[in-house]
Amino acid sequence: MSESEVGKDTTPEPSPANGTGPGPEWGLCPGPPTVGTDTSGASGLGTPRRRTQHNKHKTVAVASAQRSPRALFCLTLTNPIRRSCISIVEWKPFDILILLTIFANCVALGVYIPFPEDDSNTANHNLEQVEYVFLVIFTVETVLKIVAYGLVLHPSAYIRNGWNLLDFIIVVVGLFSVLLEQGPGRPGDAPHTGGKPGGFDVKALRAFRVLRPLRLVSGVPSLHIVVNSIMKALVPLLHIALLVLFVIIIYAIIGLELFLGRMHKTCYFLGSDMEAEEDPSPCASSGSGRSCTLNHTECRGRWPGPNGGITNFDNFFFAMLTVFQCITMEGWTDVLYWMQDAMGYELPWVYFVSLVIFGSFFVLNLVLGVLSGEFSKEREKAKARGDFQKLREKQQMEEDLRGYLDWITQAEELDLHDPSVDGNLASLAEEGRAGHRPQLSELTNRRRGRLRWFSHSTRSTHSTSSHASLPASDTGSMTDTPGDEDEEEGTMASCTRCLNKIMKTRICRHFRRANRGLRARCRRAVKSNACYWAVLLLVFLNTLTIASEHHGQPLWLTQTQEYANKVLLCLFTVEMLLKLYGLGPSVYVASFFNRFDCFVVCGGILETTLVEVGAMQPLGISVLRCVRLLRIFKVTRHWASLSNLVASLLNSMKSIASLLLLLFLFIIIFSLLGMQLFGGKFNFDQTHTKRSTFDTFPQALLTVFQILTGEDWNVVMYDGIMAYGGPFFPGMLVCVYFIILFICGNYILLNVFLAIAVDNLASGDAGTAKDKGREKSSEGNPPKENKVLVPGGENEDAKGARSEGAAPGMEEEEEEEEEEEEEEEEEEENGAGHVELLQEVVPKEKVVPIPEGSAFFCLSQTNPLRKACHTLIHHHIFTSLILVFIILSSVSLAAEDPIRAHSFRNHILGYFDYAFTSIFTVEILLKMTVFGAFLHRGSFCRSWFNLLDLLVVSVSLISFGIHSSAISVVKILRVLRVLRPLRAINRAKGLKHVVQCVFVAIRTIGNIMIVTTLLQFMFACIGVQLFKGKFYSCTDEAKHTLKESKGSFLIYPDGDVSRPLVRERLWVNSDFNFDNVLSAMMALFTVSTFEGWPALLYKAIDANAEDEGPIYNYHVEISVFFIVYIIIIAFFMMNIFVGFVIITFRAQGEQEYQNCELDKNQRQCVEYALKAQPLRRYIPKNPHQYRVWATVNSRAFEYLMFLLILLNTVALAMQHYEQTAPFNYAMDILNMVFTGLFTIEMVLKIIAFKPKHYFADAWNTFDALIVVGSVVDIAVTEVNNGGHLGESSEDTSRISITFFRLFRVMRLVKLLSKGEGIRTLLWTFIKSFQALPYVALLIAMIFFIYAVIGMQMFGLVALQDGTQINRNNNFQTFPQAVLLLFRCATGEAWQEIMLASLPGNRCDPESDFGPGEEFTCGSSFAIVYFISFFMLCAFLIINLFVAVIMDNFDYLTRDWSILGPHHLDEFKRIWSEYDPGAKGRIKHLDVVALLRRIQPPLGFGKLCPHRVACKRLVAMNVPLNSDGTVTFNATLFALVRTSLKIKTEGNLDQANQELRMVIKKIWKRIKQKLLDEVIPPPDEEEVTVGKFYATFLIQDYFRKFRRRKEKGLLGREAPTSTSSALQAGLRSLQDLGPEIRQALTYVTEEEEEEEEAVGQEAEEEEAENNPEPYKDSIDSQPQSRWNSRISVSLPVKEKLPDSLSTGPSDDDGLAPNSRQPSVIQAGSQPHRRSSGVFMFTIPEEGSIQLKGTQGQDNQNEEQELPDWTPDLDRAGRDSFEPSPFTTSLVQQHVNGHMSTPTFAAPHACRSEPSFTIQCLQRLGSCEDLPIPGTYHRGRTSGPSRAQGSWAAPPQKGRLLYAPLLLVEESTVGEGYLGKLGGPLRTFTCLQVPGAHPNPSHRKRGSADSLVEAVLISEGLGLFAQDPRFVALAKQEIADACHLTLDEMDSAASDLLAQRTISLYSDEESILSRFDEEDLGDEMACVHAL
C-alpha cells in the first residue's frame, strides 16, 4: 500500500456507533488488519477535519436530543417542514443575515428625523415603508424558529430563551402596530403623517423597535462576561437598591414635613402679577429667609416654583424626585439655595449635606463595592473555564498526535514488504518497533530534508523542542495530499540548486560578509546608550515644538516649527531604517515599541506629503501631526515600573473593549428611544435654542452620552417634562426614562469601568512581579551578535522585547536600576511596617532620653535645667495643654472677619494670637533646650514634624514684626498661619497613621499621575491644533468678526417686545479655551471632572475659524475628540487612578495583618469573639407580668407593629400642598391615633421589661424618644392652634413645630431593625463609621485649612446675584466657606466658582479698599487653590470612603460559607435564650442544642444529625468549668477558631501557646483572665467538653445496635448460643474502635455523607417512636447545609458496616433546655500524666450522695432537674459522691447532649484526684458501675510532647504494640489519638489469659479479658487499662446481647477454652491464640507510657 493510499484512507467510511476497536477518543488502529481493508485508516478523530465533523455530529445529536418531540402539537422531528426549518435556523449564514438586518434596521432608525407636531417628510415616509421589510424578515425568522423549536411547552422551546422572548415581543408589538395603522384614517390627514394613523397613537408601540440592537449582545461572546457579571451583581444590588429607596423615602417624607409648599413665594411688583426678577427665586415674607429688597416689590405666593414647578416638596412623588436628584449630586446646591432663600440658613443645610453624605458617598458607593466584587468573581470563573478548555485542547492534541504516530508506524509495519515505500518510512517503522516514538517535527524535517534552506528557515519559526506546540491542523495538511507535495518538491529542489550555485560565487560571499559586519555595527549603534539618549532628546525637542504652538504666535515661530518638524521627521525615519536594517525585519517587528514607532513615522511622512501636495484639509493634518506626540511614551521603556503600568493599562484596555461595545449599544438604544419620545419636542421655549435635544440621531447620541456622564442630566429631564406639558400627570412619567438611563448608565455601566480597573490593577500587581523575574532571566543572556536566527520561541520574545535595549553594559545598569527599584518597592510594601514602628515610637516619646551632646553649646546632658525641661515637656498635662492651645488658636483663625480688618473682633483675636504664639514659642524653646537645635542626632530640627512646628511659629513671629511694610507679604504670612492645625498630626497617633497612608498613596500614584499627565498633554496639543483662536464670539450673535463687533444692540428678555434692553457689543473669548497648551490642559481637566463639558463641546462644534465667530453645528464630528477624551481619560484613566488609591489604601490596611499570622477576616472574628458580651434577656417571674412579656415578644405583636409603622408611613406620605381642611383634620386625627398606639406599645414594653431592662436596648430608647417627641408635637400643635385641629401652619405658630414634626417621620427608621439583610447592612455601616474617625478628622483638617485660606484670599469679593459668589455661596464667614468647599468636593460647578474668584472682581463695599481699587478683588491663586482642593477631595478623600466601604462590605459578594464577623451576632442572640441572665455560662449539655440552632458556617445547622454534632464538639476543644458549664467567650472563640482553622494543626499545647502569643501581640490590653478562659494555659490541665462527650459514642452505639437487632435489621438468624451472641457483641465493640479514635482526632466529616443517607431512615424510624422530635431545639431558620469540608489526614474506611450507620437515636426528642446535674468530687492533689491524657479514677474514700430522678427507658418528656453547683472546699478533704443515676437520665445525657469522658490507664501516682464526675450509669445492671472520671488541675506539662492532631491530647513517644498485635508498625502509626496511617482496621492475633499478670489489679473474668483484648487490638490500650471502663463496655455488650454478666463470663470461658476466637470483623474470620505472656507484654507496653 503506497503512501498516497495511506493518505487517502485517512477518512474512512463512518463506522457504526457501536463499532469495534478503540473509539474515536483513542485515534488508534485496531490491531493488525488485513491489507487493503478500510480499518487500516485512522478512526473518527484521525484528522482535524474529521474531528470537527465528528464534533459537529455530536453537538447536533445532543441538540436533537434536547428538542421537543413535537412542535405546535403536530410537527414531529421527522416532519420535512420542521427538518428544513431546523436546518435553515442552524445554518451559519442565516445568523449572519439576521445580524446584518438588525444592523441595517438600526441605521434606518437612526436616519429617521423626527419633526415637531408629528410632521414628516418624504425621506421619513420611505423609511416607514422600509420598516415593513424589516418587520417581514423578523417575522419570518420568528416563525421559522417557532416551527423548529416549538413555542413554549418544551424546556428548549423558543420562548423559554430570554433573548428569543425579547425578539418575539418586538415582532408581536410591531405586527400589532401595523394592524392599528390600517384602521380608518381621520379626514383631512396628510397621507403620510408620522403620528396618529387610525386615530391611535402608535408611537408608544414603535418605541419597542429600538430594543432590536440588544439582539447583538447574544451574537458577541465577549459581551457575555460583562453582561453576566452585571446580571449576577443584580442580586446584591437589589439589597442596596432597597436601602437607597429607603433612604430616599425617609428623606422625602422629612422633606414633606419641613419644606411642604415653601417653593411657591417669590418677589412680585406691587399690584401686578409680574415677577420682579429676571431669574426669580423663592423668598420668605417673614422669618430669616430672603426678603424682597427692590422698591415696590413684595413677597407673595402663587408662583409655580423653580424649574417650571418641577423641583419642590409639594407631594411625596415630587419630593422623591427632588431627593433622587440631590443624591446624584447634580443641581443639589440649587435646591439647597432655594430652600435657604425660602426658610433661612438654619435647617436646610443640615438636611441636604446629610443627604449627600449618606446617599451619595456611602450608599451609592456600595454599588461600586458590589460590582467590583462580582466582576472579579466572574472574571476568575471565566479564566478558570478558559484554562480548563486550553488544558483539554492540549490533551486532545497530544492524543491526536499519538494516534497519528501509532497509525503511521503501524501502517508502515504492514507495508514494509511494498517496494514503493521510501527509506524514510522504513527507518520510521524500525524506530517505532524500537520503542522510540518520533516527534512530528522530526517527521516533517525528514520529509523536507533535501530542502536545506527551507528547513533552515522553519527552524527559526517552529520550536523543535516540543511536539505539542505544533497545531494539529499543520499535521493534517501534511498527511492529506502527499501526491501534490511530491510534485512541489521536484520543482522546489531545482530552484534550490540554482540558488545554491549563485550563492557560492565569490562576490556573493564577500558581499555577505561585509553585510554581516555592517549589520552588527548598526545593531550595536542602535542599542548603545548614546543612541537611546539621543532619541530621547529628539522626542523632547519634538514635544517642545508642538507644545510651543499658540494662538497669535509670530510668523518666525511658525516657520521654525515647520522646519523643526521636517528635520525631526527625517531623523526619526533614519532611526527607524537603521533599526530595520540592523535587527532584521522579524526581530524589529517583534517589539511593540518598534511597531508603534513605525506607525508614528509613517503617519508623519504621510502627513508631510499631503501638506506639500495640498490634497488634505488642514484639520486632519493637525491631528496626524499630534500622533507624533505618542513618542513621549518612549520614555517609559526603560522605566520599569512605568512600563509595567502601561502594560497593565493595555491589558485593561482589552477587557474594557467589550464593555465599550456594551456601552455603545446601550447609548444607541436610549438615543433611538429618546428620538421616538422627544424628537422635535424641545421647542417649547421660543426665546432659547436648546442644545441637548433628541432631534437628530447624532444629537441624541451626544445628549444620552451627556446624561451618562451625569453632567446636567436634571436640566435635560426638566426639558423633557416641559415638552410633555409640565409638572402634571402624564408629563411627569417622562422622568422614568431619564432615571432609568441615569441609573443603568452612570451607576452600573460606569462603575463597571472602575470595577474592571480595580480588578485589573489588583491582579496586575502579581503579574508585574512575575514579569520582572522573567525580564531579569532573559536579560541575563546577552544576545549572540553574529547569529541572525533566534533559537526558541520564548527567547525570540525576550529578544524582541530587548531588541530596542542597550549594550551589555547598559543591561547591567538596567539590572542594577531594577534591583534598586525592587528594593524601593519592597520598602513601600513594608511601608506599614514603618507606620507600625512610628506608632510604637509615639507613646515612647514620653520617655525619649536626652540626646548626647550639649544644647546651645553650653547645656550638657546632665544639666539640671535641661533635665527639668525634659520632665516638663514629657508630662502628659503639658502635651494635652499644647493640643488644647493648638485647637483654640485654630478656632481663633476661623473666627476672624475677613472683610472688616480693623473690627473690634479682629483686635481681640489679635491679642489672642500674641498669646498663642508666645506659648508655642516657649514650647519650641523648651524642646530645643532638651534636644538641642540641629547639630547632633536626635536634635529638634531633625524631625520633619518639628520643622513644621518651627515654620508655623516663625511665620507668626515674622508677621508681628512687619506690620506696616508690604501688605501682600503680611497677607501671605497670615495665610501660612493656617498650617497650625497640622501640628496636631504629630500629637494624634491615629491621625499620623492616616496621613502617612495618604503620603504612601501619593507616592504609589506617582506613575499613574505621569501617564495621565502625558495623555492629558497629548490631548491638549491636539486641542490646540484644532481649536486655537476659534472660541471667540461677539455678544451680539449676528456679528461674526472682531471688525463687526462694535457699537451696541437690543435684546428682548423672554421675547417681550415691550421691554427692549440696550447692550454693548463685545468681542470675548471663552473662559475655557485652547489658545495655548496650558489653557487647553486646564479646559480638559474640567472636562475630565465632568463639570460644564457640554457647554465646551457645543462651543467646539460651532467653532468656525481663527478669529471668527461661531456657526451653529458647524462641525458635529468634532465631538468625537471630546468623547474619546472622556472615555480614555475620564472613564478609564481617572477610574484607574481611583482604583489605585483604593488598592493602595487596602494594601496599607492589610499590611497591619501581615506580621501577626492572622489574616484580616480571622483577626476581625477573633476580636469579636474576645470582645463580645452575652445579651441580657429579661424574663419576669410575676405571672401577670410574664403574660405581658410573652405578648410583647410574640411574632404576632411584632408583625402588628410592623404593619402600624407601614400604615403610618403611608399616612405621612399622603400629605400634599394645598390640602383641604377636612383632609388636614383627618391627618391630625390619624397622627393622634398612631401616637396613641405607639405609646401603648411603649407602656406595654415597660411593664413587660421594667424600665431598667427596657432602656438597656438602644432601639427601645429610640422608640421612647420618638413617642415622647410625638406627644410633645401634638401638644405644641394644640397650643398653637388654640385647640382647633387641622389649622396648623408654621407662619401662625407661636412655637416652632418643624423640629417636633421630625419625630413622626423617625418612626420609619424602626423598620430598619426588622429585616435581617438590612440589619447586617446597618451593622456594617456602623462598623465603617468606626473605621472612619481619623479619616474624617483628616478631611475636617483639610476643609478647615482650605476654608481659612479661602476666607483670607477671596473673602473680600462682593456678593452679586447672578454670579457664583453670591448670598448663598461665598467665603465671608467660616461656615459659608466650609459649605462652599463641600459643594466643590461634590463637584457641583466648581470651575465656575474658580472663575468667579480670579482677579478683577468687584470688592465688597464694606471692605477697606483704596480709591480706584474697586475691581481688584480675587486672586490668581484661585486656580492652584481650587484644582488642588478638587484633586485632594475628589480623588483622595472621597476614595477613602470608597476604600473603607469596599473593605467592610466585601461580604456582600463573598462566599457565604466563609465565616465572617457578620455571622457572629446570631450566636449572641441564640445564646441569650439559654443564658437569659447574661451570666456568660451555660450547661455543657446545652451546647449541642445551641450549635444546632445556629446556621452554618458558625453553627452546625438543624440538618446536622445529633451524633455528628456531638462528634464535631469532640473536636472543638471548648474548655469545661469545674461546675460542668462552658463560658460564652470560650465557646464563641472555639467556634471561630475551628471554623477558620486558626492554629489547629500540630501539637495542641504548642498551637495554644503560639495563639496566646499572637493574641497578646495584637490586643495588648487583653485581660489575662479572659485569655486563660478562651485558651487555657499549658500549666492548667483543662477538661474540654469534647473529651467529656467522647464516651457518648459507646453507649449510643450499643443502644442503636440493640434496637436494630430487636427490629431484625441485622439479619434474620438469631444467634443460637451465648458464645455466638458474645462474639457478635465483641465484633460490634471492635467496629466501634476506629470511630472512637476518629471522633477524638477530628475525623468528623468523613462519614457525613453516608450518615446522612442512613440518618434519614433513622429519623423516620424515630418519628414513629417519638411524636414530638426536636420540639424546641429547631428554630425557624432557613434550611442550609454545612458545605465546607475539612481535609483530614486519616484514611477513610471503604465502607461503614451496617451497624455503624448513624442518625439521631430514639431519645433525641429531649428538649434542649433540660438541665442535667453533674456530679463533682473534690480531691486533694491534682496530678497529670505526661502523656497528656486525662485520668479518670475513683477515690476510695466515702462520699456524700446526691439523688437524681429516675425514669423509664426511651422516655420523651422533658425532665426538669435542679441546677446545682457544689461548693468545693479545696483546702479541706471534703468530697461529694452521687448515687447512681437513672437509665433514662443516662440516655438523656447521651442524647440530650452530654456524654462520658475519655479514659486513661491508671498511672503509678500517689496523688489523689481533685474531683470526679460520676455519671452516665445504666439502671438495671447487675452492679452499680459509674463511669469514673477525674479532672486534674494545676500541674505543669511533661517535658516533651509529640506532634499530633490538635484535637487529640498529645502524648510522649509512640505507642508500639506487641509484635503479635501489630502486623506492621507503620500501619497504625502513632496509636492512641496520634497520627494514623494505613488501614484503620488491624487484624491481630491475641492470646487472652484468665487473669491479668499484674498483681496490683483485681482478679477479672474471661469476659473482661476478651473486652480488653478487643480494645487493645483497636489501638485503645489506654482505655483497656481502666477496669471501670472495661466493666462499662462489658455491661453494654451484655445488655445489647441480652446476656447476664454470668452468662457472658461463662460464654467467654467457653471461647477461651476452645483456644480459638474469630476476629471481630464482618468480612472474614481469623483463628487467634491468646497467650498470657503476649497480653502481659501488651499491658506492660501500655504502662510504659
Curated annotation (Swiss-Prot):
Underlying gene: Cacna1f
Record keyword Calcium present: yes
Positions annotated with a glycan in the UniProt record: 295
Tissue distribution: Expressed in the inner and outer nuclear layers and the genglion cell layer of the retina.
Biased composition regions of type Polar residues, renumbered to the chain: 1675-1687, 1713-1724
Lineage per the UniProt record: Eukaryota, Metazoa, Chordata, Craniata, Vertebrata
Start and stop residues of the III repeats: 858-1140
Protein name, entry field: Voltage-dependent L-type calcium channel subunit alpha-1F
Organism listed in the record: Mus musculus
Protein family: Belongs to the calcium channel alpha-1 subunit (TC 1.A.1.11) family. CACNA1F subfamily.
